Amino acid sequence: MGLNPQLVVILLFFLECTRSHIHGCDKNHLREIIGILNEVTGEGTPCTEMDVPNVLTATKNTTESELVCRASKVLRIFYLKHGKTPCLKKNSSVLMELQRLFRAFRCLDSSISCTMNESKSTSLKDFLESLKSIMQMDYS
């Protein structure tokens, strides 16, 4: 009893979908992430002066997957109630873009566990610019 041809096609489709391109993202996901980052780092975007944990500073042993994991944890803050600062509450479009960015990060391999050192902080703008640089390196 073998597999029927339709089942083989479906299994191959799922295998292709789960294959890791660049940390699990295909070019379209990376393009979407970079597009969102371009929007939220644009000139005059409100709320980007707020402080977030500075998690994108890499040491010698830090892998790119770990940096992405940390960045995802920072972006997750904007889904939680305490991450919605008065500025973001007044500028819901920025909040929605940050939440959209977090959702776009789901294509990234989240199977690793990472820790965040929250003792140092940076501006949201600097965090997003650093994240954009990392994503653009993957895209090129």
UniProtKB/Swiss-Prot annotation:
GO biological process: one example: negative regulation of T cell activation
The keyword S-adenosyl-L-methionine is annotated on this UniProt entry: no
Glycosylation sites per record: N61, N91, N117
Disulfide links within the chain: C25-C107, C47-C87, C69-C114
Signal peptide boundaries: 1-20
The keyword Secreted is assigned to this record: yes
Alphabetized UniProt keyword annotations: Autophagy, B-cell activation, Cytokine, Disulfide bond, Glycoprotein, Growth factor, Secreted, Signal
Major location (coarse): secreted
Disruption of the gene: reported phenotype: Deletion mutant mice demonstrate anxiety-like behavior in comparison to WT mice. In addition, they show impaired cognitive function.
GO CC annotation, single: external side of plasma membrane
GO MF annotations in UniProt: cytokine activity; growth factor activity; interleukin-4 receptor binding
Annotated InterPro entries: 4_helix_cytokine-like_core, IL-4, IL-4/IL-13, IL-4/IL-13_CS
UniProt-annotated location(s): Secreted
Family: Belongs to the IL-4/IL-13 family.
Subunit (UniProt): Interacts with IL4R. Interacts with IL13RA1.
Main function: Cytokine secreted primarily by mast cells, T-cells, eosinophils, and basophils that plays a role in regulating antibody production, hematopoiesis and inflammation, and the development of effector T-cell responses. Induces the expression of class II MHC molecules on resting B-cells. Enhances both secretion and cell surface expression of IgE and IgG1. Also regulates the expression of the low affinity Fc receptor for IgE (CD23) on both lymphocytes and monocytes. Positively regulates IL31RA expression in macrophages.
Protein name: Interleukin-4
Gene name of the record: Il4
